[in-house]
Amino acid sequence: MAEIIHHSNVFTWAFHVSEYDGAPLLLLGSFSSVASVSLKRSGDLLLFERFTLPARTRSVALLSSHFLQSESGRHSIANILIATENGKCYLLQLVKTPEKAFPTIRIRDEFVLDTRMYNHEQLGKSIDLCPNASLWATNSFAGDIVFFFSHHPSLSKQVFAQLSIDGIILHTIFVPPKRSSSSCVTYVCLFLDSNSNPRINVYRWSKTETFSDASSYITFSIPVPSEFSLASHIIPCSNIPDHFLVLLETKICLLSVPQIECGDLKFLQTDLPCSGSHNYPLSIANDNETPNCCYLTYENGDLYRIRYSILSIDINLIGKTGSSLGNLILPCYPYIVFCGDCSDTLVYDVSVSPMSFFGSLIACAPMWDFVYSSSRHNTLLDEDINCNTVYATAGIGKSGCLVTMRYGCSSTTLLEAILTEGAVLSGIINSNHNSEFYAWLTYPWQTQILRLHLDGVVEDVTESLFLDDIKALYVINYQNTFIIITGKSIYAVTPSCTKYNLLEVSGDEEFVLAAYNELIFIVKKDLMNFKSQLLTLKLNTLSNGTLELQSLPDSFDLHDVPTCITSFSLERKLLVILVHPSPYFECVFYDETSHSSVYKVPLTGFQFGYLPHSISYLRKSNRAVYVLISSNSTLLTVYVTLTLEGVPDFKVYSNPISTDLPLTLQSPSDEFSTIYAWSDYLYIVGIDMETEQPTLNQILEVNDSFTCVSGIYDIPNKFQNSESRIIVYYSNNTLYLSELWLPQRTFSSKLNLAATPKRLLVDKYTNTLIIGCCHVLVNEITTSGLAFYDLTNSRLFPVNWPSMDIKGKPIFKPEELLYSMSFWIVADDQKRKYRYLCIGTGVRKNGLTTGRLLILTMNKDHDSNAIELRNVITINMKDPIYSVCSIGKHGLCYATGRKIGVKMLDLDSKKFCNSDCELPVRSPIVSMSTYKDYVYTSSLRDSVAVFQYDSENNSLNLVCSDTSSRLGIDCFYISQKKLLFSCDKDRLLTCFKVEGEVCTSTREQMLQPILTTVSQTKTNALTNHLKYSVIRVDKDNHNIVWGLMGCTLDGNIFKILMPNDPTSSDTIIYSDT
């Protein structure tokens, strides 16, 4: 299936849907996904969830939150109506469920809006909601308008009215009516008639309660000035009935419906301010906080506030952002959100003057290329994809940049205390005070107890608890009195630091394990015969305020000494689980009458490579619990339920994990999820409420804070909040109190290049990222250039245009455009390898475009820490060189104009030795890769074509090509599966089975997709690069699953995994981007 690794942050629509925990909650949407975002944290936009849409979005509308009744236990925050290009309407619902801390996005309903799929004339061009009636409307470019009822409990297709306009619809809105005619519905449409003249039609219904009211409407139509055809936005005036604003390139106009009814063309209008040359208004939106007020943005980032009335329109500048803004603005006081148009999502605080920057989500679009520096031979391990940083190029001209993206979550350190080396955090102890709790640390020689205050104060209370040189098995805070369980005794310490003993054992016995859950459970070991016994103790408070231990009559002799213990309740019945070194565990069950019974459960089929060392549990309900048992590389899960007869039932299964080190489990503070870690691995175990199965998720922290972790715990629930998880952990001799911001998401940073970065290469020898750029401006003349990024130190080398070689000569000519860039690896007979940097360009001069093939050597001067380039060979050609790659041991394949050719290098003379080897092709090849002597290409007329190089005859021959003529973008061949993937301008991702020799028959040369119906499905975004093989190793079945990586023009990076059977119905997988 397709999985998006890094989502695009190019949002084309946005809504302020609610307030969540005192902060604005937004829904941001792209063509392919929806994200819920909170603005609570200063300097960061907290992204809760991503939801991938079934098809590409065409239009959206925000419905009222009471549009659908909330289900039991679920609180509906917002409902979004989305029309997609597959002809369907989807109702997306943002709901808050008791099981999850964050709002969840889901599809609530759907129906077919138009059977004309993937057609620009289908309905769904825009969606308008009626403010005073239960109606919504949608339209098409072809002039169709359909009105639907919206007061039904589900999105059934119930049409109120249908209209048809002879022309092209540009903009439509519902206009709020006067209070005296609140049942009246007014609909305004700006369109171009059959003669391309702009007109405005007004449709008015006196009432819209039943189907019979649909035909009882009146309509008015007026011609408007031709400049109205350039209107970018139309917005209703919510506080001025029967009025709306029209935004033009140089003017803003206030129109009234009664004026249109009278045919009056003298609209109230005013000229827009001149905001610099070649800067035009981008977006306009109503200010919901201030009546008769809206915001206006310009391309250069200027922000204006417009106040309007039926008499005047006033425009005032309120701020300059200093950066290019998107074409969408969303006011949500005190913030304003800017997004869209391949721009970053920017948030500014307008409650202060001048307005201040709040936070951003970096948009890596348009994305041209991406690389993983950790790849080996163009292959990635699936388990390493999320753990590594990806580098991508994006932007055009001055906005060009290098973007680094990493998947994970962020953390904020609230407190840190440097301690003695060698501790393990063994637990968190609650306190009766509201602002403090205790951390329990275990050293090989003693136990240490620290009191932690939320204001940052750390206090060592070990000495007051009489723990000097004593190692505790368990520590309990019972009614502000500490109960300390050691190997030889149990004693209590009062708040006044008075100590008294509760229980002691004889010299040939010792306590080895303890647990507490209403009762104290202790495993006592006999040192003489190595037998053990489970004791059950109850705490009682005496009249003088002291405590005593009451030993319950039930004590159990155990078969051997267990290694870990835990206790929990099921419907007020206590259960104690003890895990033994042999593959079995024992469960002591206490019913309501305190009668106890013992169950011995064998772990058949499971072998502990190492001793089971930690145990915890997750609660599913009052009658079901998941018990987690940790051993080396294995997490055993025991599902414990109560039967109808009230006795426990057990089911056992395992989850292998990816670390060889032991894991420490905590007793979960909320009993629904637990966090655990060891060394550099951090995990969260929870319960998936839909599948009712435990989920094991590795948490990646982008700040690399969690290294050498030995013990991690949640702080008590009373200090937690819904947006984050506050944890305590011990790492590198330091105790940290940190706030972990979940869920995980992509974190991006941007380095500006002031050019268009089109190609990326990773040089393993110098550990450098090579960035091939176009549109480099040197002395007011555009050319190309090279930039370099140091992967070792994570910094960009100083960029100096124009790019020079080691002799100080410019590498690129004026008006030279970089098209392709590749490494050429040449191997000689002694298996020595030489590496060259090959660049294909196009040079425009005197109205003609020629091409150059540049072959360079690249080295790193370690003294000056600079990259040195030397021009070795330059080949001039009649046409631009669109693609270049290596073939064979010392061959170079290139595509120039409508030809593909191969040149072979003589290693002795360092010159090309073969005669001309070129083959005409139908159209220019835009992408090319090789495997052995085969060349896989994408061209402007063929999504894929395969050629073979015959070294004996020095000739290229066509092997096969696509059956249909499609404008190809890129292709990628997975040799292990003999599968060739292609992407094209129709947004198709197609897979072909490629195996065979050169065919003489034209029909035999045609490639057939494996599954035509599936491969012809459109993807949500344009895939423009296919890159990297992906290997997933199934450790259970010892199977290897292959896949590939790809990216889309709007900034998504995705992976595709294929089943082992290439002829199965799941072989063709397309990106749901």
UniProtKB/Swiss-Prot annotation:
Signal peptide coordinates: 1-36
Glycosylation sites: 132, 544, 632, 703, 732, 953
Highest taxon, organism lineage: Eukaryota
InterPro entries in alphabetical order: Cleavage/polyA-sp_fac_asu_C (IPR004871), RSE1/DDB1/CFT1/CPSF1 (IPR050358), WD40/YVTN_repeat-like_dom_sf (IPR015943)
SUPFAM superfamilies found in the cross-reference section: Putative isomerase YbhE
Record key words, sorted: ATP-binding, Glycoprotein, Nucleotide-binding, Signal
Record-level GO cellular component terms: Cul8-RING ubiquitin ligase complex; mRNA cleavage and polyadenylation specificity factor complex; nucleolus; nucleus
Pfam families: CPSF_A
Amino-acid positions noted as binding ATP in the UniProt annotation, renumbered to this chain: 392-399
One record GO biological process: replication fork processing
Gene3D superfamilies: YVTN repeat-like/Quinoprotein amine dehydrogenase
Molecular function in Gene Ontology: ATP binding; nucleic acid binding
The protein's name: Uncharacterized protein C3H8.05c
